Amino acid sequence: MRLLAWLIFLANWGGARAEPGKFWHIADLHLDPDYKVSKDPFQVCPSAGSQPVPDAGPWGDYLCDSPWALINSSIYAMKEIEPEPDFILWTGDDTPHVPDEKLGEAAVLEIVERLTKLIREVFPDTKVYAALGNHDFHPKNQFPAGSNNIYNQIAELWKPWLSNESIALFKKGAFYCEKLPGPSGAGRIVVLNTNLYYTSNALTADMADPGQQFQWLEDVLTDASKAGDMVYIVGHVPPGFFEKTQNKAWFREGFNEKYLKVVRKHHRVIAGQFFGHHHTDSFRMLYDDAGVPISAMFITPGVTPWKTTLPGVVNGANNPAIRVFEYDRATLSLKDMVTYFMNLSQANAQGTPRWELEYQLTEAYGVPDASAHSMHTVLDRIAGDQSTLQRYYVYNSVSYSAGVCDEACSMQHVCAMRQVDIDAYTTCLYASGTTPVPQLPLLLMALLGLCTLVL
């Protein structure tokens, strides 16, 4: 009997041993196909709008979206740094920040196809889990809750990465679920179309559950729990608020509430959440009713260096970034996060791009891993220690902004990271003595038809 118990123990111990793996996360590539180095500052890039771009370099400019040279360099840098990842997360926003009339459906599809071919060329044997961003549609932001030509065409483009079931789902609503590769077979990737919940999407504003995605997510997470699987949730637009200004929520309030309700209900099977959209480097914490951290949401910085036009944002540009996660293949627990970047000014001055380590999460913040508990510790240190806050603030812009994060800045960032719930976020700002800024400028922009360019 003792021998049998010992054999069972050994079997369980062997099954629970760590299986270290790595995966890439890239976001917000925003190719500007018309970028060119020009002596005329008004002829450099359409994505700069009416702003002059003096002294533009071959690798890009902070007022512009990515030239092809920058995107090409970023994907090949991934291959050089970690050539055999288990998989790649690619969370969308591929087209430039230009008005709809300067783009069109054919141009959107052409850009997505061009980037897809590049990634497949550099990583021919790597599974890619790709999501659409709010700019990956025409007209931008206006994602329908049902089938359409763009969903159909992109599903065909991504066919080598998708199962037959995922292709059918993608054509209906641009979301899907895939089993993770690897020997354990105990993990799933859920790719969401969170553009359906975006405040700028007028098509879904009055819907309770666009595309039935919430119900589908409930079903997938329930099934994962029964099967003993862990899940990564992936999307473009995150819930909660932008940290570089006040009171800018991305989801409509009802959708934000529903998403948080689903995640809190199923948090035991959710090993990580991964989003983009911000172009900045940040994270969000979710807590249960007792205040215990239950999930961390990682917002990956963009490849594009483009300076946001969102009202209230100061120094809204960033250096280009790519990110690799270290994880346990058996449990999907996140062990570390390493961000690499290109100093764009330096690359243009030297004529050669150099992708270098910006920081490693565990070393930068002195935590053992990237679990929800550890990220809660990181947030507490950011909120309570000025030097840690300042370090985070530099990382937030991918080492672009060297300015000081003062008290008002600190509250904007900390409240956004700590409170993803809309009412709790507002309470956090008031409790800090900061009066939330009304969204009148955004309303005026919407009336003027300009809101499509801000992110």
Curated annotation (Swiss-Prot):
Disulfide bonds join 45-64, 405-409, 415-428. GO terms for cellular component: extracellular exosome; extracellular space; plasma membrane; side of membrane. It is found in: Secreted; Cell membrane. Glycans are attached at residues 72, 164, 343. InterPro entries: ASM-like_Pdiesterase_prd, ASM_C, ASMase/PPN1_MPP, Calcineurin-like_PHP_ApaH, Metallo-depent_PP-like. Belongs to the acid sphingomyelinase family. This is Acid sphingomyelinase-like phosphodiesterase 3b. It is a lipid-anchor; GPI-anchor. Keywords: Cell membrane, Disulfide bond, Glycoprotein, Glycosidase, GPI-anchor, Hydrolase, Immunity, Inflammatory response, Innate immunity, Lipid degradation, Lipid metabolism, Lipoprotein, Membrane, Metal-binding, Secreted, Signal, Zinc. Interacts with TLR4, TLR7, TLR8 and TLR9. GO terms for molecular function: hydrolase activity, acting on glycosyl bonds; phosphoric diester hydrolase activity; sphingomyelin phosphodiesterase activity; zinc ion binding. It is an enzyme of class 3 (hydrolase). N-glycosylated. Coiled coil: none annotated. Its cofactor is Zn(2+). Binds 2 Zn(2+) ions per subunit. PANTHER family: ACID SPHINGOMYELINASE-LIKE PHOSPHODIESTERASE 3B, SPHINGOMYELIN PHOSPHODIESTERASE. The keyword Disulfide bond applies. Its EC number is 3.1.4.-. One of its GO terms (biological process) is negative regulation of inflammatory response. Zn(2+) 2 binds at residues 93, 134, 236, 277. Zn(2+) 1 binds at residues 28, 30, 93, 279. Lipid-modulating phosphodiesterase. Active on the surface of macrophages and dendritic cells and strongly influences macrophage lipid composition and membrane fluidity. Acts as a negative regulator of Toll-like receptor signaling. Has in vitro phosphodiesterase activity, but the physiological substrate is unknown. Lacks activity with phosphocholine-containing lipids, but can cleave CDP-choline, and can release phosphate from ATP and ADP (in vitro).
